[in-house]
Structures are given as C-alpha cells and as structure tokens.
Amino acid sequence: MRRIVQNNWSKLVAVALVLNLSITSCSFYEEDLKPSVSGEGVIKTESREVEAFSEIELETNATVYVTEGAETKVQVSAFGNLQPFVQTIVNGKTLIIDNKRSFRSEDQITIYITVPSVEKLTVRGAGKVISQGVLGTDHLALKVTGSGEIKVAADAETIKSDVDGSGTIEVAGHAYSQEVNISGSGKLLSYELLTEASQVQIGGSGNAFAQVAKKLDVKITGSGEVKYKGQPTVDTNITGTGRVSQLI
C-alpha cells in the first residue's frame, strides 16, 4: 500500500511540474506573439524622471543624442501611442533604453539625454547613439553588438571600442590611448581621433581606421584590415589574409 501511495504521489508531482512548465511557456509564447505597434497621431516629447547614471545602454531601434550638462535629463520623442512602450530604466549606474513591444522601423524613436559625465555607451541591435558636443571623461568605453552605430567626439585619457557584428563606431577628438576589438565585419572609424598609442585586434573581416602618433599594435585573425595615419612604430601579428597599411 505504501508503495502505491508513493507512486501516485510521484505521478501527481510530475503532472504538476508539466502543467507549470506548460503555463510558463504559454505566457512567454503569448508575449512573443503580441503584434508590433504602429505610430499614430502626433509626435510628442515626454520628459522621464530617472536616477543618476553614467552609462547608457540602447536595446531598441532608436536614435539617442547625448550631451554633457550639469543636470540629468531624459526626453523621449515619439508618437503619443508609442510613449508607454518606451522604457527608460536605471539599473545601478546604467540607463537602459528598451521597448515593451516591437515598433515599425519607420516609427523612429528619438531620445535626448543630458548627463554630467559619460563612462560607457552600448548599442545592442540596430539603434544609434550620437554625441552632441565633446564628451569629456578619463575612460570611455564604447560597444556595439549587432548592426548599430555609435558616433561620438571625446576628450579622454583612454578609449576602448568593441564591435561584435556588422556595426560601426566612429570617434573623433583626443585620447592618449585607444584599444579596439572587432569581431565580425564591423568598422572602427577614428581618423579624426588623435592618439599617442593604439592597440587594434580584429577577428574576421572587420576594418579599422586610426590616427596614431607613436605606437600601433595590430593583431588580425582573418581578412580584416587596418589603415592608419601618422608615423608610429608598428607591430603586427597577422594570421590569414589581413592587411595593415599607412595612409599618406
């Protein structure tokens, strides 16, 4: 009798687990099936109340303009019916910009951010982050995952740029040193960034363009290419058909 009860109890537990997993899966599935939202009405600009932050992470198809200023401000410009679906949440020291529902590509969302100091900018997907004016900071990190774009002017001690995918990072201004990592077919455009030393690493078919005064270290695995301005000493480590060339 005890064995029968135990077997029945085991079966009940198994059934409960299956039902729970089914309900959870259905919830996620229903969320994924929600249709995209189309912009309607007029464009509205809404100010968002947020906590202090020094890093920005864009996870949706939007264009973000970043300006350094004394006060922290976040303004979202979009069709009125899309405003509730645009999320601006601060997690730690990072402002995360995302959407609760997918939008049509033509319903472009524009976000204007003013912040005292910027330490890191990240784009995941196809969005864009553009600086208005020069970003002044000791260390600036830039990262694109996907086909997105970051375009900034900066005055920094060090700048670290990472591209994973087919995205583009474009940097102008001044930095003592620059570190670049490209994985895939992405691009780093830093012709207008004056650096003393730059370190570039490419895995894949990516391209990097740099202006270096003293020291350039290059490592390429694949068919990537590095072009540079200036008269630095150059150390190369190439596996594959990659190339390094000087622009006159």
Model-derived features with residue positions:
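Intrinsically disordered, low-complexity terminal regions
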Residues: 1-248
